[in-house]
Swiss-Prot record:
This is D-ribitol-5-phosphate cytidylyltransferase. It comes from Homo sapiens. One of its GO terms (cellular component) is cytosol. One of its GO terms (biological process) is isoprenoid biosynthetic process. Changing R126H: In MDDGA7; also found in a patient with an atypical phenotype presenting with limb-girdle muscular dystrophy, ocular features and cerebellar involvement. Homodimer. Pathway: Protein modification; protein glycosylation. It is an enzyme of class 2 (transferase). Its EC number is 2.7.7.40. The record marks R59, K66 as: Transition state stabilizer. Ubiquitously expressed, with high expression in brain.
């Protein structure tokens, strides 16, 4: 067993398939205290998780194993690890990965600063990988460096959207019943074909459920089940709950899961996952300007238009003054979208200050941060061509900060003297800003758009 995070700063490329938001929420943690037998005010120390991550992803139709496929330039498995490690009462996370991808996994752990992760080598099947992960937590293994948990969660590396509430439910049920698993209603009717390819029978959809992840077990129950497991079940079995029933006579409690427990299986699922992630990190926009007192400042006008046009998004504003203390707090609170208003048309001073603050923070490690550098110009008084040369500095700025996962765009908004025309320019600018934030298109960084 190997523990992270060794390896290089940049993840290596995953090998081809070989044949053969924030911390845990107080309510959930408090509820688990009685489950794990901890004293009030202390985090439970009896829950671990095992993630089998040795699959080839043949149904994905790409050479890279799906757990390493990038979403917003970050491997899928990193999102799943993040979902688990932000739950403070999961003390150890064991990932089973193939030998040829061990270095890849180490570098992912290092680059994205994952914690509490230990690595073991995967087996040739899913069940053998899970068994190897359980062995890393068992007391009877000579080289085991981890303490045995009371409850172990088994989850898929390619289900990145698991929430703490679902984890809490299955752990609580496993504590009481010995085993528990998340289920969802069947989407399609299940049929059984006969040998000649005709319908034999169909299942009544209302009476059956789809087994999902996560699942949780008393560690002694599932470890004993795997120790007794036949070679046939280790090779061809797919359901961990069935092993607990078959070998330990433990009937699992079935827990209704949330709709976002789905598994990334096909290539189209990667696009769906990316869309969900983009939506989640686009729910807040901070308008940054050089003043906080003048309500008629054009930055405040833009803020009000953004609020009007994007009524489903939280829009706030902060000044760069006071050493940026309030702005630093917004960064700590994980806002991933900034609109920086520059007072002088050709001056990037405010944008440069903001970029420096972002680069000094750890905000950009997990998700790309969008910065829209906004400049205003009365096109009737000053033709855009006269200022364009200075504004094109944004190209070089964008190249530099892209290396630190910051997506920098430029926006030039017409600033006419007529109030009605100004409102229309601001509205067009808000539409462009919303699109840049929603799409997060790295191909457009350094471009100067005009509203």
């Amino acid at each position: 067993m190997e523990a992270g995070p060794p390896g290089s700063a940049r993840p290596a490329e995953p090998g081809p398939c070989l044949s053969g938001q924030r911390g845990a929420d107080h309510t959930a943690s408090a509820s688990l205290q009685s489950v794990a037998g901890t004293e009030p005010g202390r985090h439970p120390q009896a829950v671990a998780a095992v993630l089998p991550a040795g699959g080839c992803g043949e149904r994905m139709g790409v050479p890279t194993p799906k757990q390493f496929c990038p979403i917003l330039e970050r491997p899928l498995i990193s999102y799943t690890l993040q979902a688990l490690e932000r739950v403070c009462w999961i003390k150890d996370i064991v990932v089973a990965v193939t030998g040829e991808n061990m270095e890849v996994m180490k570098s992912i752990i290092q680059k994205y600063q994952h914690k509490r992760i230990s690595l073991v080598e995967a087996g040739v099947t899913r069940h053998r990988s899970i068994f190897n992960g359980l062995k890393a937590l068992a007391e009877d293994q000579i080289n085991s460096k981890l303490s045995k948990p009371e409850v172990v969660i088994i989850h898929d590396a390619v289900r990145p959207f698991v929430e703490e509430g679902v984890l809490l439910k299955v752990v609580t049920a496993a504590k009481e019943h010995g085993a528990a698993g998340a289920i969802r209603p069947l989407v399609s009717t299940v049929v059984s074909p006969s040998a000649d390819g005709c319908l034999d029978y169909s299942l009544e959809r209302a009476r059956h459920r789809a087994s999902e992840m996560p699942q949780a077990f008393l560690f002694d129950v599932i470890y004993e089940a795997y120790q007794q497991c036949s070679d046939y079940d280790l090779e061809f079995g797919t359901e961990c709950l069935q092993l607990a029933l078959k070998y330990c006579c433990t009937k699992a409690k079935l827990v209704e899961g949330s709709p976002d427990l789905w598994k990334v299986t096909y290539k189209r699922d990667l696009y769906a996952a990316e869309s969900i992630i983009k939506e989640r990190i686009s729910q807040e926009i901070c308008v940054v300007m050089d003043t906080e007192e003048d309500n008629k400042h054009v930055g405040h006008l833009l803020e009000e238009v953004l609020k009007s046009e994007l009524n489903h998004v939280k829009v706030t504003s902060e000044a760069l003054g006071h050493a940026g203390r309030h702005l630093q707090q917004i960064i700590l609170d994980q806002c991933y979208n900034f609109v920086c208003v520059n007072v002088t048309t050709s001056d990037f001073q405010e944008t440069q200050k903001l970029l420096s603050m972002l680069e000094e923070s750890s905000l950009c490690i997990l998700y790309p941060v969008v910065v829209v550098s906004v400049h205003f110009l009365d096109f009737k008084l000053v033709p855009p061509s006269q200022k364009m040369e200075n504004l094109m500095q944004i190209r070089e700025f964008a190249k530099e900060v892209k290396e630190r996962n910051i997506l920098l765009y430029g926006l030039l908004i017409s600033y006419p003297q007529d109030d009605q025309k100004l409102q229309e320019s601001l509205r067009q600018g808000a539409i462009i800003i919303a699109s840049l934030i929603k799409e997060r298109n790295s191909g457009l960084i350094g471009q100067l758009l005009i509203a």
